[in-house]
Regions:
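Domain-terminus/edge residues, biased toward the C-terminal soluble/receptor-binding domains
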Residues: 121, 134-309
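Active-site-adjacent loops and short helices of periplasmic peptidoglycan-processing enzymes
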Residues: 1-144, 154
Length: 309
């Protein structure tokens, strides 16, 4: 795990941050980064329409059940990818963005090299493990590398517009009615300042989370990988979430040491506890609730350059 000051990249806390393991659906953060670059360059727009193919619709795992007879905008698919963690949506945007999924994965790895993610290799746009290949043939990264990616996303894309949304309907015009999506990030709306970024889980990856929170103009990034419950059991991410809460508070405590006393006191004010952490990694649909976007369009922000923590 690693805790980083988002503004400077300074490491505030770490524990085996260079251990290599699968990121699971956190892979979709790099997919978002590459699509954001395409939109910023003018190669795509958020309104670009994507005709779904049979290949898109055959993705397993978490999905929005795309059908080859359907068409959706890039924007709709990005919401599905970031909120529902939809593998079929990730596959569709990757295919359209680069002409093929294989070409898109090459762009993902090029972006990783650009950001200095030296222990990262991507092989999919969604993070699903290979069904019949060795573990080494799947997506691999480290908490330190993913902190670099998170900083890039925060400073150079509008990722928070998507990652901060707790609930949203997908496919409003579908004949069968919309799918009610609920964000898998259980800290949203419960822990002060949390507005992203992405969870992940597979049997080999364990429970993963790239989280970020902002308080009084200061922001921390927390990356946790390979979390399991007691005795290595599945716990729907409860252990991961409780650890993330602890690390977020630890990060703000470290940042507060450099602030004036009044701001330090405010930053360290107690936040609402989570007596029972409800998890939605495999949960079913929930009612739609509206959410106001934080930004409009993929625009670059003025921020410090991305540096390796």
């Amino acid at each position: 795990m690693i805790v980083v000051d988002a503004a400077t990249g300074r490491v505030l806390s770490e524990d085996n941050p260079d251990d290599v393991s699968p990121p699971a659906s956190m892979t979709k953060l790099m997919t978002f980064a590459v699509v954001a670059d395409k939109i910023s360059s003018g190669a795509l727009t958020r309104e670009t329409l994507v005709k779904i193919t049979n290949e898109d619709s055959k993705m397993g795992g978490t999905q929005v059940y795309l059908d080859a007879r359907e068409t959706f905008s890039i924007d709709e698919l990005l919401y599905a990818m970031m909120i529902q963690s939809a593998n079929d949506a990730a596959h569709a945007v990757a295919r359209v963005s680069a002409g093929s999924v294989e070409a898109f994965v090459e762009l993902m790895n090029a972006k990783a090299r650009e950001l200095g993610m030296t222990h990262t290799t991507f092989r999919t746009p969604h993070g699903l493990p290979p069904s019949s290949r060795l573990k080494a043939d799947g997506d691999l990264t480290t908490p330190r590398d993913y902190a670099l990616l998170c900083r890039y996303l925060l400073f150079h894309t509008n990722v928070l517009q998507y990652s901060s949304v707790q609930r949203r309907d997908f496919g409003l015009n579908r004949k069968q009615g919309p799918q009610h999506m609920r964000n898998h990030n259980n800290l949203l709306g419960k822990i002060a300042g949390v507005d992203g970024l992405k969870t992940g889980y597979t049997a080999s990856a364990g429970y993963c989370l790239s989280a970020t929170a902002e308080r009084h103009g200061r922001r921390v990034i927390v990356v946790i990988m390979g979390s399991f419950g007691p005795n290595g059991q599945r716990d729907l991410g409860k252990t991961r979430d409780l650890k993330a809460i602890e690390l977020i508070e630890r990060g703000f405590t470290a940042l507060a040491s450099s602030l004036p006393n009044n701001l330090a006191t405010a930053m360290n004010a107690p936040t609402a506890a989570i007596p029972t952490v409800k998890t939605f990694e495999s949960a079913g649909p929930t009612p739609e609730q509206s959410s106001t976007p934080r930004a409009d369009g993929f625009t670059f922000r003025v921020a410090p350059p991305v540096k390796k923590p």
